[in-house]
Amino acid sequence: MRIAILWTELSGYLNACLKELAGRPGVELFVGHQVSSQDAPFALSQFEWIENRLMWRDQRSLRGIATRLKEFNPDVLVFSGWHVRGYRDAARAFKGKAWRVMTMDNCWLGTLKQMLAVIAAPAFPRPLADAVWVSGERQAVFARKLRFEQRVILNGLYSCDSSAFHAARLERIADGNTRELKFLFVGRLAREKGIRVLAQAYSAYRARVSAPWPLICCGTGSMETVLDGQPGIEMTGFIQPSELPRLMSSAACLVLPSDFEPWAVVVHEAACAGLPVLASNRVGSAIHLVQPGYNGYLFDSQDTEGLAGLMQAMTEMSEPNWRKMSDASFQLSHQYSTERWADILLEGYSMAMSADSSSR
């Protein structure tokens, strides 16, 4: 089976999923993707195993993809959204020739732009794809509004490198399963990630407790100066995927105060590593991976005092209660895995082919 994956920027977690897919019997991959951005400078060496690959920087450098796809002749064409013209053209070109799957992580927010997309859906983007692959239920709501029937909606678009983070958790358990007294933030240091709220909440939290935990901040971006130099905050810069499991295992809680976050794979990474999670109500993956009082807590994205209070509660939590939350996160993490990611795509294709045969 020949599968073409047309993505935006590759990441460590997608790399793990692609390796799982490529390892399945009879699967041959072609991957088209945009070069990495400065805010997420993933080492290109980790993707060198992909033999059939096309990297592009802009629409001009994407022109060669039509020829490459024609030569590859995919049975399955997975493409990222409808915003890349070259991918839209490819989807149209392979109508009736390949099973076309559009990926989507946009939550339904009811914005004017989304409402216009719903009105236009029968003409665009619905005809571009035979199925849509969404990250979760908030995205499935949008997909249904775009005229995708439930039978052609695939879930579980994203998974972290689940085995690597599970292994980090096991290492911590082998060392006594004690929590490292640190908060952890992982993400781009950008306005939509709630960086200012994070800085203010952490400062308020430090004023409330006698022995505050440090806050480890991993990432780069335009708002680095908001955090850098603040008491108790340690800046690491961008962390490569191979280093992140170890970092997760050396913290006690993930904090994610995003103001705009369609999904956030880092929540799955934290859950796999057995970390409780404090996430804003704008984090798309939280609806599936954070159960308030069970493995973490939710807060309004602009509620600085609310976040400070939750950080205080986490600091004052007993070790046995922290372990319960840690175990709960691990249990919730099993909703997604690299194995399941590959299964979803291959099972979806099999069902689509069976339905097509039955209709003839």
Where would I find each of the regions flagged by the language model?
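Short alpha-helical donor nucleotide-sugar binding micro-motif in glycosyltransferases
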Residues: F238-I239, R246-A251
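Conserved acidic donor-binding segment of nucleotide-sugar-dependent glycosyltransferases
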Residues: G237-F238, P292-G293, Y297-T304, Q312-E319
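Donor nucleotide-sugar binding/catalytic pocket of nucleotide-sugar-dependent glycosyltransferases
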Residues: L128-T178
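Aromatic "clamp/platform" in nucleotide-sugar-dependent glycosyltransferases that forms part
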Residues: D259
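Conserved donor-binding/catalytic core segment of Leloir-type glycosyltransferases
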Residues: A174-K193, A199-S203
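Nucleotide-activated donor-binding/catalytic signature segment of Leloir-type glycosyltransferases, i.e.
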Residues: T225-S242
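Short hydrophobic beta-strand element within catalytic cores of glycosyltransferases
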Residues: P276-S280
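A short, histidine- and acid-enriched strand-loop-helix "catalytic/donor-clamping" loop
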Residues: W99-L116, L128-A131
